A protein has these predicted regions:
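Short, charged/polar surface micro-motifs in flexible loops or helix N-caps
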Residues: 31-33, 41-45, 64, 108-110
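Short acidic-glycine-tyrosine-enriched beta hairpin
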Residues: 72-86
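Ligand-binding loop in jelly-roll beta-barrel domains
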Residues: 86-110
Length: 110
């Protein structure tokens, strides 16, 4: 997404839902930062994965589910902020009956 700054962004307007897999949208990217949007239909999951040298912050915008982190399952609802440090396996599962929308911020940018 090409933006002029300052530009207000309404993440939900850029959500890309897919019936077959988690939807992903990039809202902003520079050499230092990536701001993305993950969109989950009920039952969808972003399997455990890790990022070498990148910290990741998730902010739940809508819906509910589970944050998977090092063998733990942490409940998440709208307004929850979660951190996945570099090299730590993490994932997300939509366990709710509605769509789950999660802002994902990675630094530095991949």
């Amino acid at each position: 997404m090409d933006l002029e700054h300052p530009t207000p962004i309404r993440p939900e307007e850029h959500a890309s839902f897919d019936a077959n897999r988690m939807g992903k949208s990039t809202l902003f990217q520079s050499e230092r930062l990536l701001v993305g949007l993950n969109a989950f239909e009920p039952g969808q999951e972003h399997r455990l994965h890790a990022h070498a040298g990148l910290d990741k912050v998730y902010h739940v915008l809508a819906g509910s589910g589970l944050f998977l982190l090092e063998g733990r399952e942490v409940p998440m609802t709208a307004g929850t902020l979660l951190v996945a440090p570099a090299e730590v396996p993490h994932g997300i599962r939509n366990t709710g009956s509605t769509r789950l929308l999660v802002l994902a911020i990675l630094a530095p940018s991949p």
